[in-house]
Amino acid sequence: MRLIRAHRALEVLPTATVWLIITAPVWGALVIPAALGFGLVIFSLYWLWKSLVFASGVLIGFWRLHNAQQRDWIAESLALPGYEKLHHLVIVPTFGESEEIVADTLHYLALQDVALERVSVVLAFEERDPSAPARAQRLSARFAALFQHFLITFHQDREGEVRGKASNLTWAARRVQAELIDTGRLDPIDLIVSVCDADSRLHHRYLGALGYEVLSQPNGFLHIFQPAILFYANHWRLIAPLRALNSIYSLWELARMVPSHRLVTQSTYSLSWRAVCEVGFWDVDVIPEDSHMCFKVLFHFGRRVKVRPIFLPVYADAAEGATLRRTLENQYHQILRWAWGVSDIPYVALGAVRARDLPWHVRIMRVVWYVEEHLMWPSHWFLLTLGGLIPPLVNPAYAHSTLGMWQSSLISAILGLCLPCLLLVILVDWRLRPQHPDGEDSIDVLIGWASFALLPIVGLLLCALPALDAHTRLLLGRRLEYRVTEKVPVQARFRDQQAAPAMKPLGKLAPLRRARFDQLPQYRAYAPGSTTAVTDAVLLVYRDLR
């Protein structure tokens, strides 16, 4: 009972603090105007510091991303002991995604430059999806012979579980244990698990780089590995303001990988089978399964574990829908689900207390960084915009005083110094994002750059408000139901183009897998409408090679 009360208190405290912060420009201007002014000055300095860290992280991340794509990870791995025994297990949980969405992801797995005899795939469906058996059968027919093992699982809902990715992953992992490991078909000692979303396109060097990182690091089989998630796969299908917003999300994902000591996994990540088994698989009653699993492994193994970045891109779809309204709704609900990570604050805080094998300063800072992120997410917009607008309306006498005007001028000057950081980030985005399928003229470039000026509006509607929604639900004791982000079918993504991108001749499978990833049209390996034919051709070549 005491633990339950502590858990609930740790849910209420940060969420109530957020509401206290965002309403501070109103009540603070009336009760403690001078203290509010100095508080806003301090927050402005904090935001300038975060802007500098963000911009420098984007630059360093961009440089490391470029270098990592040039390295021959396989050649470097050959000299490491145990390389030939290493086996990759890729679990792809899916619910409701179309066959072509999942096939697109599997195509990119087939392009990996590691030997596919050392890659096994698990397609983890939900039993409640009525179309899952038919899609599973077709996907198995198209891809099963490409990999060492190709396992199909159907997660059955059970009492006490939360419908979502975590419970599906645990079900799939238990089926792997029963069907592949207990039967001796896979060796668990040298098995590396990668969790891959249904719309994630792995860079063709990712599994090779993952193997190198596992084998070259002390305690590599205990570490967790995080690639760079970039929401560029459907970049040009979105309207300009949403392109700007998702560019910021992509670059934030890249920048946060630079200070790896505070890195937490998200979406697509990798860890050893040993780590998965020793912590008892994924907890089936949580929604933010990625960060939760990260802390679960960290607290279990202690100082031996590190979360290590792999600076290779994983191209994912930004939230999209068949109409503009559906796109906005899907974007809102996706951010709401991400922000629901605030519900894990009690787990992180209480877990840090029990994790005696971690140094005390590491435990404290891990909690502080996690809480800081979730406090600033819903509140920063209100402080940056309304913090300077509301106090003069509520308390004009103080606003026109000498101290009030000095504080206002100082805040404006500090925030003005953040603009060069934003310009630098926009420039890196311009260099990093995919080229327009029809080419960009000067008008398109200007529209793209000008769309960043709408970030204050888009940031309120599709960043601050969904995060505040998550906090409010948790504060009121209302739980969130897992909602899968809608994916637009592969063919629909190209409906605005005059013709599908030309496809290169296949040749043999090995040269196909070694093709430069950044030369593939729109970061997709195959043209829409031809994926079945391509898979069949690759399948025939691969069968001949075997």
Language model feature labels by segment:
Residues 2-14, 89-93, 97-102, 358-381, ...:
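Loop-to-transmembrane boundary segments
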Residues 109-121, 401-404, 475-498:
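Hydrophobic alpha-helical transmembrane segments and immediately flanking/interface helices
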Residues 309, 322-401, 428:
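Long, K/E/R/D-enriched contiguous segments that form extended
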